[in-house]
Amino acid sequence: MTKEEIIKPENLVYKKPTLMNDNAMHYCPGCSHGVVHKLIAEVIEEMGMEDKTVGISPVGCAVFAYNYLDIDWQEAAHGRAPAVATAVKRLWPDRLVFTYQGDGDLVCIGTAETIHALNRGENITIIFINNAIYGMTGGQMAPTTLVGMKSSTCPYGRDVELHGYPLKITEIAAQLEGTAYVSRQSVQSVPAIRKAKKAIRKAFENSMNGKGSNLVEIVSTCSSGWKMTPEKANKWMEEHMFPFYPLGDLKDKE
């Protein structure tokens, strides 16, 4: 029997977004990237922007994002995604333009590009995946690594006197005049996924309505980098990440 014969249209309650193709994802088990990709695809389809969306992919775990979502993509040099997005949006103001970046790409090497694009009020959206570690390169300390959190480059835990404090880029973004909507969400549960999708939708709509820059941070896990099972990683995130990176809207300029 075919899939269509097994699952009748009248009984179908959920299906994969059309924009997500059948390529096998390279992400580790338990990774949040796949869920966020799905949310982005759903929002784009619901907005009817399938043929008018440009994503800017980063250097990092999501470097191959263009293999999974059938929209127009542009690869950017490490940390320069907001600058590339600025150019694309200014050339094509009718396009929905977003960047998809991790904490290393956005908060470390790309800090300048991020801050200045947001401060200028560019009509773009930044999707920021914060798992507090460098996942692609083997689990090194990131700018967002928590105090006391261990990594391959701080095996005894992040030391404030040696490494400084974790950088809360989302709080900084909320203080900038050019930002319209700044939110921090997660995708570790069904209610959280629904809230994250709502935040992404609002950010994308703001971008298309010329309200200014938008940033949606997704606090995430990295089972491989944290050396935990997906289940333990989710629990650790709730107990340690959420208190330092509290969820919710930080700014909503109506």
Model-derived features: positions:
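Thiamine diphosphate
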Residues: 1-135, 198-202, 209
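Glycine-rich beta-alpha junction loops
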Residues: 59-61, 131-133, 189, 218-225
